[in-house]
């Protein structure tokens, strides 16, 4: 069960990490990127932000074709920065279980934010992306 106590490294999670919340080449090129909208920050598994980023930002077929390679790169980078005791299988499981985050974000955002044509389309896409990813990985079963 994924909704019980979890072990492993935790980090600062953005919670709404998607392309709309990232600026590139900021401060006149002094910084390569900056991240906006920190209202949903929390502590947890970093794989949640990775999972949400891919479900909210990639077409389903592209995500399916490349997600395991992208998550492996993420895992290798963690190890390169000194994260220990977080094996690939645990990282991949955290990633898959975190797919429900996209569902939560899409639904809760649609409830909390003023409706516009753009926000309706955005939240529908976020929810669909999260649902498809969660179904692809059996994430709802991991939370049972």
Model-derived regions: residue spans:
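Tryptophan-centric aromatic hotspots in well-structured domains and transmembrane helices
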Residues: 1-2, 15-18, 23-24, 38, ...
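ATP-dependent phospho-/nucleotidyl transfer catalytic cores
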Residues: 1-14, 25-28, 126, 133-144
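Active-site-proximal structural scaffolding
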Residues: 6, 10, 15, 43-46, ...
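Conserved acidic
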Residues: 9, 62, 66, 87, ...
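Active-site lining segments that contact anionic ligands and/or coordinate catalytic metals
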Residues: 17-19, 30-33, 92, 98, ...
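Catalytic activation segment of kinase domains across protein kinase-like and atypical kinase folds
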Residues: 18-56
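Active-site activation/catalytic loop segments of kinase-like enzymes and analogous catalytic loops
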Residues: 40-83, 99-121
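Helical subdomain adjoining the active site within ATP-dependent kinase catalytic cores
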Residues: 83-93, 102-144
């Amino acid at each position: 069960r994924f909704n019980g106590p979890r072990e492993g490294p935790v980090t600062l999670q953005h919670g709404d990490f998607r392309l709309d919340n990232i600026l590139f080449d900021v401060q006149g090129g002094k910084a390569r990127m900056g991240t906006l909208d920190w209202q949903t920050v929390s502590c947890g598994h970093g794989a949640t932000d990775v999972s949400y980023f891919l479900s909210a930002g990639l077409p389903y077929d592209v995500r399916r074709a490349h997600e395991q390679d992208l998550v492996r790169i993420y895992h290798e980078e963690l190890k390169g920065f000194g994260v220990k005791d977080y094996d690939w299988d645990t990282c991949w499981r955290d990633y898959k279980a975190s797919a429900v985050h996209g569902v939560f974000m899409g639904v809760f955002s649609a409830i909390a934010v003023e409706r516009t044509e753009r926000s309706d389309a955005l939240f529908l896409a976020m929810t669909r992306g999260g649902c498809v990813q969660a179904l692809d990985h059996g994430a709802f079963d991991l939370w049972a």
